[in-house]
């Protein structure tokens, strides 16, 4: 039981240090920032972009 407790404490310490190193917290958005439209063509455009990036198996359909 004691070994399990120590193992859990070490795992928690490692995870917390990893979060502290990688984290940095959420940075507040700039006041003048304009939201970027990542998907201007809607769902169909997003689907076609995925097909183009992954290599569409049927070229006439992909455009």
From Swiss-Prot:
Please state what the protein is called: Contryphan-Lt
Query: Further notes on this entry?
Result: Exists in two forms, due to cis-trans isomerization at 56-Cys-hydroxyPro-57. The cis conformation is the major form.
Keyword Calcium tagged: no
Q: Which cysteines are joined by disulfide bonds?
A: 56-62
Q: Where found, per UniProt? A: Secreted
Residues of the region (Disordered) are: 24-43
Q: What is the lineage of its organism?
A: Eukaryota, Metazoa, Spiralia, Lophotrochozoa, Mollusca
Q: Which residues carry this modification: 4-hydroxyproline?
A: 57
Signal sequence bounds: 1-23
One function term, GO molecular function aspect: toxin activity
UniProt source species: Conus litteratus (Lettered cone)
User: Mind telling me which residues form the propeptide?
Assistant: 24-54
Mainly localized where?
secreted
What is this protein's function per UniProt? Answer: Its target is unknown, but this toxin may modulate voltage-activated calcium channels (Cav) or calcium-dependent potassium channels (KCa).
Family stated for the protein in its record: Belongs to the O2 superfamily. Contryphan family.
């Amino acid at each position: 039981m004691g070994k399990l407790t120590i193992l859990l404490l070490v795992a928690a310490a490692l995870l917390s240090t990893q979060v502290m190193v990688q984290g940095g917290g959420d940075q507040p958005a700039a006041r003048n920032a304009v939201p970027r439209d990542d998907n201007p063509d809607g769902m169909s455009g997003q689907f076609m972009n995925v097909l183009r990036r992954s290599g569409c198996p049927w070229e006439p359909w992909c455009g």
